[in-house]
Amino acid sequence: MEYKPTAVVAAGGAVGAVTRYALSVQFPGIWTIAAINVAGSLLLGVVAAMLGPDRLWRLFLGVGVLGGFTTFSTFAVDAVRHPATAVVYVAVTLVGALAAARAGMAAGEAWRHR
């Protein structure tokens, strides 16, 4: 195992997870998790499009920070726990995340090629 990439991912993951936790404490509820997942998808789209061969930055920001920031498991548990809003919650999260990732990639490409 390479220690430098592992440390970079761990540091980024700590930043992302603590940020998600702080937001969920400040703004409790399923819609905060939906917003976090959509925002994380947007930012990951930007990172994926903008960062070239710099492996450590991609690992820090993509796998670490944004991997720790977003959460599929909490999304799934929230959907099960809130059956009355589950369909809307799932649709908003999935469609929003896909649209945000696409928009982030387009923005990242535009920024990279300017």
Residue ranges and their predicted role:
Residues M1-R114:
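Membrane-interface helix-loop junctions in multi-pass transporters/channels
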